[in-house]
């Protein structure tokens, strides 16, 4: 199963890099490249095809970043069904197909080589990366963890919403004091768009406000990276 996930990521990455040299990767541009019409829709994004009429419906009512991710997912599924991609979900794993194409969508929109190049150039400034790749903060943060050793924390209205680490790195249950200071500073400066950087004994921490706040939720995204030698 792990091989299938890697194959999906590799196919999506190859597709993105074949058409884009820098972010953002645009799924609708890719669809048009393959001659697939885009049909604006007020309902859920989906695709359908028959022998002569492939078509991708794009949900214009969705939050824009979510709509891009959904379009990437549907495009990969459609290109696979049409035989443009060297990828297929085995019948016995059909119940995992949605998760697989979600995984592929993340790699399509944030192909590893482009993400690493942009990340290293900007010292993994999530604010810059989010603007460059035009994806949600959570999707970006989770993908960044595949390429840099760090702990990602998302805080909503002062409470931890999720906390995850890079593979092989332990996820402490509680926030480090440096993380807490960065979070507190981000909320104190709200709605300033600037990030808050804090250097602790063992961690380099940076916190970004997610603006504008949505539905009364003030979200702060925190990336904590071990200091060299730890």
Residue ranges and their predicted role:
Residues 1-230:
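Active-site hotspot residues in diverse enzymes, especially metal/ion-binding acidic/histidine motifs
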